[in-house]
Amino acid sequence: MKFTKFFSFLLVVVMMFSFTTSTTLAASSSKTVTSRDTMSLTLAQQTSGDSSVATFNFSGLPSDAVVTKVVVDANSGLTYGGNGAIVSNRVHIKNDSMDNYTSAPWGSLNKTEITTGVIGQPAAGTWSIYYNGTNVSILAGSSWKKYSSPKLTVYYNYE
């Protein structure tokens, strides 16, 4: 008698787990590339402008890899000088398959996560970035700011 009750209880538990639905999320992969380029910007007092472009080669990724987000990390090679302070405003990014750049506000600690405009884009290919900055100084003369060897991490899934 005890065996049948135990077996019935066990059967009910197994049935409960077999009828519940579970959600599985696709694992996201990522690749980080360091650019050999420097994003540099020189500005006169109280002016804004765009830096030079840094490029990243992601040609080794599978052709069916699509972007879920990208992260720009410009923290490692920051140098600046001159008569003022240049504030980084926005980072602009595109890859080979995009007609135009998309942008996002510059992130804290020089790291910027971008999803808008890049989700669903092919991950493979050449990516390009630059930043927009403003010299907030009231001192006469110009200032410069450089981000050497920025890093770009592309997070992707497969179609």
Question: Model-derived features: where do they sit?
Answer:
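A eukaryote-biased signal for long
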Residues: 49-51, 64-65, 109
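A general structural motif
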Residues: 64-67, 124-126
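A short beta-strand element within beta-rich, extracytoplasmic domains
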Residues: 65-79
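Beta-strand acidic-aromatic groove motif in beta-rich domains, primarily in extracellular
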Residues: 80-93
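Bacterial Sec-dependent N-terminal signal peptides
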Residues: 1-13
